[in-house]
Amino acid sequence: MAARIIKFDQEGRNAILKGVNTLADAVKVTLGPKGRNVVIEKAFGSPLITKDGVTVAKEIELEDKFENMGAQLVKEVASKTSDVAGDGTTTATVLAQAIYRQGSKLVAAGHNPMEIKRGIDKAVETIVAELKSISKPIKDHKEIAQVGTISANNDKTIGDIIAQAMEKVGKEGVITVEEAKAMETSLETVEGMQFDRGYLSPYFVTDPERMEASLENAMILIHDKKISNMKDLLPVLEQTAKSGRPLLIIAEDIEGEALATLVVNKLRGVLNICAVKAPGFGDRRKAMLEDIAILTGGQVISEEIGNKLENTTMDMLGRAKRITVDKDNTTIIDGDGKEADIQGRVKQIRAQIEETTSDYDREKLQERLAKLVGGVAVIKVGAATETEMKEKKARVEDALHATRAAVDEGIVPGGGVAYLRALASLDALSLPTEQQFGVNVIKRSLEEPIRQIAQNAGVDGSIVVDKVKNSKDAFGYNAAEDEYVDMLAAGIIDPTKVSRSALQNAASVAGLMLTTEAMIADKPKEEAPMPAMPGGMGGMGGMM
């Protein structure tokens, strides 16, 4: 085992503090409407320009191993806040730095770090409760647009597009962000349920100009196995032909004579039919087929539950007002499923989302939920250059997360004002003297976000803090316009979830760092010098 270096007490805490300061100082320049950009070198391609705190934090790795530990712990604060609330990463970093800096001074002066941590925890609990009590539910399109605008660094276009997307697909809908091929940022919405499987043969197309198969008032056969034998399909095809309605077949695959017969019948005009592969794989495929069946009021024809393809009757088929199939996607609009069944399925998926520990599974479950209840919106981000595109796309994603957080838990006045208003709740706390020092750490640290916003705008932070502290309600400093306004009326708002998560995560990690008494790291290896080049071979003197 390699030799280790150990640092104790104040020496260790000072190393952590140096690392925390290095990372936080790089991140906090991005805070607020007048925050600056950070340019990050990339191994390939052009440098990355960003104003996103977590992106800056993730790029920082320090040479000194002990300082790097401090930096990595604060990086964890930014990442966790980003995961939970999707925004507020810079605020969380600023708070973590302030709490640790204030706390480490007290520990150096001989105070008990464990008691300080207890005081910090109790103060944070009180502040979080106060933030929830001053939080206001988000009501309309305008407020959603304001949250999006603030989080996208005051880009009103992005705020408006996100508000439109939320309005169209609802709270549960899926909103994805993609790079556009044009210069403008635009919004596309998909009604109904869409899945990424297109027609199995171009001969199924009904609109050659758009290369689409369009089925009006259609029946849907949903089967979980391959169909290659035509005789299994014949009974259901005969019944559909008699009804004169179009038919969509969704199966694991359709091949051989079955596919050939369907194409021939389509070309002869006997049947208006289209066949697509089932979406997803494995267990997820079964679940998605069941979703389609519930949405359209049909059944999955599966031998597992005793349904054979040759015994399928018309009442087992799903129904939909309109189905559109192109080479890549199938969209089912206005399915005939019972509302009670759909709501039951939605409840079941929500329960699975609560239980799952995998981010990937959660994302896939949310997609399924959106397809059942709302729909899907795609924001296509346009820009003049690739560098601008990446930066803008990151801002849109941040704004989208912040907007969802605002819909979840409501909004509080922005610009660091909510923290100052919540400070009064700490006066009611009656704690032992040592723990009271921890409360004082939080009192001082909660001034830091507004102080930093003012400093980034080129104004004296202390004057701004004092003026806002001595006023009431939502009165605060609008750094974008350099004026004091009612933050709620001016649309400068933060999602409560973001403010809450930033403080909780910052205090959690700062508390751990304060109670650190020893640090262990690998001893740097001394690189052996390169061996000298060997001499020339004998008899080579005459060579040129």
Swiss-Prot record:
Annotated residues for binding of ATP: 30-33, 51, 87-91, 415, 478-480, 494
Enzyme Commission designation: 5.6.1.7
Q: Which Pfam families match?
A: Cpn60_TCP1
Q: Where in the cell is it found?
A: Cytoplasm
Q: Name one GO biological process term.
A: response to heat
Q: Under the GO molecular function aspect, what terms does this record hold?
A: ATP binding; ATP-dependent protein folding chaperone; isomerase activity; unfolded protein binding
Q: Which InterPro entries match?
A: Chaperonin_Cpn60_CS, Cpn60/GroEL, Cpn60/GroEL/TCP-1, GroEL-like_apical_dom_sf, GROEL-like_equatorial_sf, TCP-1-like_intermed_sf
Q: List the HAMAP family hit by this protein, alphabetically.
A: CH60
Q: What does this protein do?
A: Together with its co-chaperonin GroES, plays an essential role in assisting protein folding. The GroEL-GroES system forms a nano-cage that allows encapsulation of the non-native substrate proteins and provides a physical environment optimized to promote and accelerate protein folding.
Q: Quaternary structure per UniProt? A: Forms a cylinder of 14 subunits composed of two heptameric rings stacked back-to-back. Interacts with the co-chaperonin GroES.
Q: What is this protein called?
A: Chaperonin GroEL
Q: Which organism is it from?
A: Geobacter sulfurreducens (strain ATCC 51573 / DSM 12127 / PCA)
